[in-house]
């Protein structure tokens, strides 16, 4: 396999992985909306810092075991948590 062919193959695989990540993000967003509905029924706030801290701890454990950059992992987690909170707040506003 030539260098160019190998490069193209790897780029194609990288694109595929990126698209799978986006599909998983969509699923995560769907779960956040369902969580918002339950929180609304139970009159619970959007934020639960103990849940966030536990997720952060578990995320760092996985990042370390996979030899990934912790800063990157935390930035990604914060982005995901921020989007979940945004969706939950939006859902709560719609029901108010």
Language-model features: where?
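Domain-level signature for soluble enzymes in the chorismate/prephenate branch of the shikimate pathway
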Residues: 1-96
